[in-house]
Design a protein with these regions (language model features):
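Transmembrane alpha-helical segments of polytopic membrane transport and secretion proteins
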Residues: 1-51, 296-308
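Periplasmic/extracellular loop-to-transmembrane helix junction in inner-membrane transport proteins
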Residues: 26-49, 63-106, 262-276
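Interhelical loop and adjacent transmembrane-helix boundary motif
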Residues: 85-86, 238-287
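Transmembrane-helix boundary motif in ABC transporter permease subunits
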Residues: 106-136, 149, 296-305
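Transmembrane alpha-helices
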Residues: 107, 181-182, 204-241
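Amphipathic cytosolic juxtamembrane alpha-helices at the membrane-cytosol interface
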Residues: 125-129, 133, 190-222
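Generic hydrophobic transmembrane alpha-helix motif, especially the helices
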Residues: 137-173
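C-terminal transmembrane helix and the adjacent membrane-cytosol boundary/short C-terminal tail
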Residues: 183-187, 222-225, 265-308
């Protein structure tokens, strides 16, 4: 019994041309895809190298300060006041309290101003709002020593060195970060919520307080924390507004010590114990700034995910 084998007919002229074009397009697409994958891989490698090179100085700084400063930490370091030169056993309790007072007062001064200015910027448009944004951007780029000199000329010359003059200088330093951060946070609130609140008959002030501000609280907290992290480590404004003291003081009208002062003065001392105190103060300051920055960035990341 014989079997016949059926063979597929050869493609005609048009079909052959179509098949050839399809094979050509598929080959070109595969080559393009391979090239794009190679480019994407190269870009990822370059970005990874850049990120690694960026993290090297940070890791070296954190490791070096930790190595030099962690040995100074003790109960006495956090509870005692500084001792005279050459006498070991001193601490930075007055500097810790002074930094909390100065930066806390600066935060109290800058927070309402930054919030009100940000509310004005999201409600008003025009040359005045643009000028305020431009001024905030310029102020954020000014060297902190100029802000300290400004506070010295306006406050210290007419009064005396004090904690409140240092707080005013740091508040000016924090303001541009708060203004721009608060504005961006409140812009994440949808316009529909504004319109819904006004349509219900609520006053604009009530809508702002109950809808806009309440809806942007995570972003406002982030902006304030990042501004505080900027002000905590500044030394130049303090040099013009208050003076280093070994006394424990909580008066806003008197000179008050701060952690940057301890780092600046003890770090340049010829005595080893004071140098060790400076490294310990640097470690405490570094940890504090890192904690504030991490908390602020975490809030910012959550706000971004929520807005999406």
């Amino acid at each position: 019994m014989s079997t016949d084998v059926l063979e597929a007919p050869a493609p005609s002229g048009k079909d052959a041309t179509y098949a050839a074009r399809r094979q050509l397009i598929q080959g070109s697409a595969r080559a393009t895809l391979k090239r794009r994958r190679a480019i994407a891989l190269a870009i990822r490698i370059i970005f990874g190298i850049c990120m690694f090179l960026t993290l090297i100085p940070l890791a070296f700084l954190i490791g070096y300060v930790t190595k030099r400063g962690i040995g100074a930490l003790s109960v006495a370091f956090f509870t005692h006041t500084p001792t005279p030169e050459g006498i070991p056993g001193g601490g930075i309790s007055n500097a810790i309290v002074g930094s909390l007072i100065i930066n806390g007062l600066a935060l109290v001064i800058a927070m309402p101003i930054g919030l009100l200015v940000a509310l004005f910027l999201i409600e008003r448009r025009g040359p005045i709002a643009n000028a305020i944004r431009f001024g905030a951007d310029v102020l954020s780029g000014l060297p902190s020593i100029l802000i300290g000199l400004f506070a010295y000329s306006v406050i210290v010359v007419h009064t005396h060195y004090s904690a409140y003059s240092a707080s005013v200088a740091l508040a000016v330093l924090m303001l541009p970060i708060m203004i721009r951060g608060n504005e961006e946070a409140m812009r994440t609130v949808p316009n529909e919520l504004w319109e819904a609140g006004l349509a219900l008959g609520a006053r604009q002030s009530r809508v702002v307080r109950s809808v806009v501000v309440r809806g942007s609280i995570p972003g406002l907290v982030t902006a304030n924390l990042l501004a505080l992290a900027r002000g905590v480590g500044e030394t130049a404004p303090l040099l013009f507004t208050t003076i280093f003291t070994q006394q424990f003081s909580t008066s806003l009208n008197q000179p008050i010590n701060a952690i940057p002062f301890v780092i600046y003065y003890d770090g340049t001392s010829a005595f080893k114990d004071l140098q060790q105190d400076a490294w310990g103060a640097a470690f405490v300051l570094m940890v504090g700034v890192l904690i504030l920055s991490i908390i602020g960035r975490t809030f910012a990341a959550r706000l971004t995910r929520k807005s999406r």
